[in-house]
A protein has these predicted regions:
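Membrane-proximal interfacial segments on either side of biological membranes
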Residues: 1-71, 75-181, 194-272
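Central antiparallel beta-sheet cores of small beta-barrel/beta-sandwich binding domains
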Residues: 186-188
Length: 272
């Protein structure tokens, strides 16, 4: 649903109501909202959009839209929307984004440090599902063309090279064990990361793992940093690794979670 959303701007509404005199609960609704450079802020994790322009049709059962244009993360985007039979709202979108936009979903110190070595912007396609049963999920794919890095091998990338990226945000658990899960994979495990953070009201501790040169998995607790490779530049990776480890040490948290989240494991594996 759009509960908790806030919007502003100029819009035109066409509305038709069919209200049975003896059965008002069976009222039928049909309408069209024409948006012109509107602003829409939905609850996290859906990013806010500006310059929202296009037509949205709706009934008592849901909403639909095609080729609505907007700006997300200050870059052009296009979206389509439809409502499933079970009430799930599905958004399909595409556009341009800068890598640092990922930090909107989780401003993890390790991820933030890694993103300081990345510049440029790239095209993407993605989907948002807003389900009455499972909440909000987000998935994004990109080839990262247009993005470059100044990290050591195997994470040194030129702007013209193609590195497939997948990003996923989902929910797990409920009540005091409810948590958000964020997973990123770049160029088939050149870099991978997975993080779980507590949802509002949850008492679970954050945990996660980031890996270079291999696929990573959620640890039982705390955070892990793994670097694997056949030909690692020891000097350059020492500098980069020290910065990542320093960032990881900022992960200690306070609050209502059970315990804290700290860097529990660092491994470097030079493959033969």
């Amino acid at each position: 649903s759009f509960e908790g959303s806030q919007g502003s701007g100029t819009a035109a509404l066409e509305l038709t109501l069919d209200i049975p005199l003896l059965h008002a609960r069976d009222t039928k609704v049909k309408g069209i909202v024409t948006l012109e450079e509107n602003v829409l802020a939905m609850p996290w994790p859906v990013p806010p959009v500006t310059d929202l322009t296009g037509r949205v049709t709706f009934t008592e059962k849901g909403a639909w839209a095609e080729r609505v244009t907007a700006k997300a993360f200050s870059r052009d985007a296009t979206l389509n929307m439809h409502t499933e039979e079970d009430g799930t709202i599905s958004l399909a979108f595409s556009g341009l984004a800068q890598p640092r936009s990922v930090s909107y979903f989780n401003n993890n110190p390790i991820l933030a440090e890694a993103l300081t070595h990345v510049k440029g912007e790239t095209s993407y396609v993605g989907a948002v599902s807003i389900s009455p049963a499972t909440g909000v999920s987000v998935s994004v794919q990109s080839d990262l063309k247009g993005v470059s890095t100044d990290l050591p091998s195997p994470l040194n990338k030129s702007a013209g090279s193609v590195w497939p990226l997948t990003f996923a945000f989902s929910n797990a658990g409920s009540g005091k064990t409810a948590r958000h899960r964020i997973a990123v994979n770049v160029a088939r495990n050149r870099f991978s990361g997975i993080v779980e953070v507590p949802a509002e009201g949850s008492r679970v501790s954050p945990r996660g793992s980031f890996a270079v040169g291999r696929r990573t998995y959620l640890p039982r607790s705390g955070f892990a940093l793994e670097i694997t490779g056949k030909t690692l530049d020891a000097d350059r990776w020492q500098t980069a690794g020290e910065a990542l480890i320093a960032a990881a040490k900022k992960l200690a948290v306070t609050g209502d979670t059970e315990g804290g989240a700290t860097l529990e494991r660092v491994s470097v594996d030079l493959e033969e």
